A protein has these predicted regions:
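Terminal amphipathic helices with adjacent charged low-complexity linkers/tails
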Residues: 94-123
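Glycine-rich tight-turn/loop motif centered on a GG-T
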Residues: 56-66
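Charge-rich, low-complexity amphipathic helices
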Residues: 23-24, 64, 101, 111
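Conserved C-terminal portion of the radical SAM core fold
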Residues: 1-55, 69-98
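General N-terminal targeting signals
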Residues: 25, 59-61, 104-106
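Alpha/beta catalytic cores of nucleotide-metabolism and tRNA/nucleoside-modifying enzymes
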Residues: 64-74, 122-124
């Protein structure tokens, strides 16, 4: 696709069921280490739980524990550090008000929190 002039944009969601911090970071590193991937742009969406979804039912049944704001930040900081400069980070969280989510990151300005709290570790 790149040979035809297309830009490649990936979406990456840390915190999905059956993952943990190490697995999320290793998976993201593979996106840039493997020459079959290497996106030009990326959007990071920490897993959020919305009412009426299977994930919501799993959470209510105690079968899934979503990551909270701090856990999401702890996963995204090393991921951001590893993201090459050529790759544009387009988004760090969905622009959906937190009142529509049942669990997960509790801030609408999550990217700002990462920049302020972890600024020495993140490229802006």
């Amino acid at each position: 696709l790149r040979d035809l002039g297309f830009k490649i944009n990936f979406h990456y969601m840390p915190g999905l069921p059956l993952t943990d911090r190490e697995r999320d970071i290793a998976g993201m590193k593979q996106l840039f280490d493997n020459p079959d991937y290497r996106p030009d742009m990326i959007k990071y969406y920490p897993c959020m739980v919305a009412p009426g979804t299977t994930l919501y039912l799993q959470w209510k049944q105690g079968k899934f524990e979503p990551i909270n704001t701090e856990e999401a930040a702890e996963r995204l900081v090393p991921i951001k550090e590893y993201t090459p400069e050529y790759c544009r980070i387009q988004r760090i969280q969905r622009d959906v008000p937190t009142k529509y989510w049942s669990a997960g990151v509790g801030l609408t300005n999550f990217r700002q929190l990462i920049h302020e709290k972890y600024k020495p570790k993140c490229r802006l």
